[in-house]
Amino acid sequence: MFKLTSLNLNGIRSATSKGVESWMAATRPDCICVQEVKAQAADMANRFERLADLHGHFHFAQKKGYSGVGIYTRHEPSDVVIGYGSAEFDAEGRYVELRFDTPERKLSIISAYFPSGSSGEERQQAKFRFLAEFHPHLMRLKAERDFILCGDINIAHQQIDLKNWRSNQKNSGFLPEERAWMTKLLHTTDEGGGIIDVYRQLQPTATDTAYTWWSNRGQAYANNVGWRLD
């Protein structure tokens, strides 16, 4: 059985100081997709390039201490793709793809970090531009090969994907346009789609146990007032 994990690190230095390497060793994934590495190549050398006997491949942001994604793998990929060809967003370190190809099958594993629009209108518009680029990229990839997309999507698709959906309908992460993008991705249409939300396929009614992000405000984590953004 192939074991795949996805995790937002919120900084690799912080995560390792809190025991993520021991957790990786204990859970023994074949691949672990990570987001928000918040480091540069020089920071990783001789320390974070390899964790728990898994070798890492990364896409770093040009801006220091910002964004960055990676995939730690137990298996050598046949190819590594850094970025998805975006003039705007490849500078932000948001996409790494490992290809595991055999004569019988072409398979990609992707770690992606979607932009957040919560800081203001400028970043929300950037998020919309990212979504407009990323859907056709995934559809082109789907026409060529199988893939598994992991990451911090920064979108709660359905009402059951966040605690307080009524009060968040005008907030980034649950905007109608963002949710419509997810629907287009997951449902087969003339524009493509047909991607499977694996978590929802396995847990179609899960609510309180589904959350992956909690606000730092108030007692959101203590009260499990969360969102499924990953």
Kindly give the residue locations of the regions a language model identified.
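N-terminal, active-site-proximal structural segment of metallo-dependent hydrolase catalytic domains
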Residues: 1-50, 61, 66-67
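Active-site-proximal beta-strand elements of phosphoester/diester hydrolases
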Residues: 2-10, 106-118, 150
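Active-site beta-strand/loop signature of hydrolases that rely on acidic residues for catalysis
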Residues: 7-8, 24-42, 109, 138-159, ...
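Short catalytic/ligand-binding loop motif for oxyanion handling, primarily in non-cytosolic enzymes
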Residues: 13, 41-43, 65-66, 118-120, ...
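Short amphipathic alpha-helices and their capping/turn segments at secondary-structure boundaries
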Residues: 22-25, 95-104, 133-145
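Structured beta-strand-rich core segments of catalytic domains in phosphoester-bond hydrolases
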Residues: 38-40, 44-117
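Metal-dependent phosphoesterases centered on the DNase I-like endonuclease/exonuclease/phosphatase
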Residues: 52-55, 130-228
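Surface-exposed cleft-lining segments at the edges of enzyme active sites
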Residues: 85-86, 114-131, 166-172
